[in-house]
Amino acid sequence: MASSTIASPSASFIPTKELGRSAFSPASSPFSVPKCRKSISKKIVSVMAPQQSERKPAATGSVKTAMTMTEKILARASEKTHLSPGENVWVDVDILMTHDVCGPGSIGIFKKEFGQNAKVWDREKIVIIPDHYIFTNDERANRNVDILRDFCAEQNIKYFYDIQDRGNFKANPDYKGVCHIALAQEGHCRPGEVLLGTDSHTCTAGAFGQFATGIGNTDAGFVMGAGKLLLKVPPTLRFVMDGEMPDYILAKDLILQMEERMTLCNMVVEAGGKNGVVPADSTTFKYLEDKTSLPYEPVYSDQQARFLSEYRFDISKLEPIVAKPHSPDNRALARECKDVKIDRVYIGSCTGGKTEDFMAAAKLFVASGYKKVKVPTFLVPATQKVWMDVYSLPVPGSGGKTCSQIFEEVGCDTPASPSCGACLGGPKDTYARMNEPKASGFEFSI
């Protein structure tokens, strides 16, 4: 199976403390808690993690068998006392996610290998979220959603976020939007668990201290029937960040709040990683308070854990960067691209369509004195909740205006229905698709 041969490393992100001592001090654990407060100039500070018995660090591992977070999570899921990078182990899956692009193929493989009348291993652990090709009249795209709907009815899948009225997404209370953001908002991302999904950006969920990675349709079809998968334990790269956060650094440049952590883990796959993981802390627990009632057990890397390599960054010296065509690693400092003409702007997707992202864009317009946009600017909220936030939350410093009001004032396009939009292309009637013989010279995406 494809996933068993992946040798890409895991990435562990550790923001160091700026003030005081945390519950996980260097004497007992190498972590502290990142927290952003505008009133203290965006300093990274440490806070006390809640002392709750069901959420204390897992006992898996010891000084004699020190492990990283990823190794501990996979050890728990494989019922092993210790794991080392390179080992292949059968891992019990806590959540399997699929969507309208890969779901039909995964379902087909499940039925072929397990039988036409086979039942999934656990109807409450499979999450199906249509999000890619939704607001289109393309018959094949619509058929994909029909296949998901039929399968969920047949299997009595508990978590199917369906959409039937594509003309008005708000008429579909079950519909959420982009799977990676919806998974978090609906409480499916929990510390210490294993989440697999048929999408490369499934690693987004690592922001919650869980092992999350993308798999193919064949693997997903197997998980549907067996509830487990053969995985290779990856080596871990450790990233330590400290210093004061400059005002001009945004979510894609570093991790602070929960949504920004999701952005960082989301982009691990672009760096060649198998998964990214951030230690769960009070910020994580607070986010999950009203989203899940299921118990979970966070784990933390042992102080003696071995890492393939470690990188340290002084965030006070970081600058905004731009990924240029045609590869994510073709990067440059934003100031080096100041003379590049931009043809279109697209704010959206799983990495840039969260509430924090639209807030950041709106604040820039406020700071500019509400200057009009000079190029077409498309807006695609990731989920229904984000769409509502865009229309309801006041933007600081705007006198009470919402993001939508500010975007309208400066000439942006009306926020579209929540989905993956143009990120993956799609049928000809996909929102923001050019449908022209020549591609745009330079499109700026947030």
PLM-predicted stretches and their roles:
Residues 2-446:
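Fe-S-dependent hydro-lyases/dehydratases of central metabolism
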